[in-house]
């Protein structure tokens, strides 16, 4: 492929150079043939024989240069045409030899092999430059079966409030059901202890906060005794002294 592209480039260069030389030669010939364009045919004031001789020599030189340019351009064009024809023949011969060496039955097999190789290369490139998505990174929007098959540790479940606070809702309900089913049987000590342990923390806190009030009421000596008076830490301000000092502070008239 590289050799073919280089040959095509050389052909294009030859044709361009040949056309340029041909056009330049034609322009020079027309410059000398058409009257009025050449400087030798312009009228001169002196009209001496020297100017006529010089004009004839210049005209002959320009004609010779034009003929050379036209001939070189035509030769380059013919050379480029011949080279292009030769390259086309070589290309056809190579294709014929390839068809003869590789029969038609081997063509589909070779195409399958090429397609398999291309698929493998594409897979390798995709695996090399693979970028995971946000869901894959965060392990979300996956089916449970797929997650368990890949890695059972990936399934994340948040703990409940009861498990964090040490409470369990199933045990109190089960104890209540047992009590309702058998009202004649006395409750077991272990079940009662378990029920005490499984009381909510809020209830415990409220009870503990009200215990000191209960003790205070129980420890009162008698109802006739007045309650203890609570005196403020700082004494109240003396308003009389402030009123007496107020007129003294006024400025004199």
UniProtKB/Swiss-Prot annotation:
Residues 224-238 have a biased composition (Pro residues). It comes from Homo sapiens. Residues 93-133, 164-253 are annotated as: Disordered. Its main location: membrane. InterPro entries: TMEM51. The chain crosses the membrane at residues 17-37, 65-85. The modification Phosphoserine is found at residues 115, 182, 192. Residues 206-217, 242-253 have a biased composition (Basic and acidic residues). Residues 113-124 have a biased composition (Acidic residues). GO terms for cellular component: membrane. Residues 194-205 have a biased composition (Basic residues). This is Transmembrane protein 51. Coiled coil: none annotated. Keywords: Membrane, Phosphoprotein, Transmembrane, Transmembrane helix.
């Amino acid at each position: 492929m590289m050799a073919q592209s280089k040959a095509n480039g050389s052909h294009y260069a030859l044709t361009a150079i040949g056309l340029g030389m041909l056009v330049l030669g034609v322009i020079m010939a027309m410059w000398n043939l058409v009257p009025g364009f050449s400087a030798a045919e312009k009228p001169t004031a002196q009209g001496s024989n020297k100017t006529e001789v010089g004009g004839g020599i210049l005209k002959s030189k320009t004609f010779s240069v034009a003929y050379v340019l036209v001939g070189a351009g035509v030769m380059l064009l013919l050379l480029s045409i011949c080279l292009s024809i030769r390259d086309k023949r070589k290309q056809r011969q190579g294709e014929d030899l390839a068809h003869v060496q590789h029969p038609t039955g081997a063509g589909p097999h070779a195409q399958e092999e090429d397609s398999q190789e291309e698929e493998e290369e594409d897979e390798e490139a995709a695996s090399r430059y693979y970028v995971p998505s946000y869901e894959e990174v965060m392990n979300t929007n996956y089916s449970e079966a797929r997650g368990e098959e890949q890695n059972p540790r990936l399934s994340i479940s948040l703990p409940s409030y009861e498990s964090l606070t040490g409470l369990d809702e199933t045990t109190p309900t089960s104890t209540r059901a047992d009590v309702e089913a058998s009202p004649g049987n006395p409750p077991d000590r272990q079940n009662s202890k378990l029920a005490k342990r499984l009381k909510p923390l809020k209830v415990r806190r409220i009870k503990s906060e009200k215990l000191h009030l209960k003790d205070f009421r129980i420890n009162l000596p008698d109802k006739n005794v007045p309650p203890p008076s609570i005196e403020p830490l700082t004494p109240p301000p003396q308003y009389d002294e402030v009123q007496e000092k107020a007129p003294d502070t006024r400025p004199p008239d």
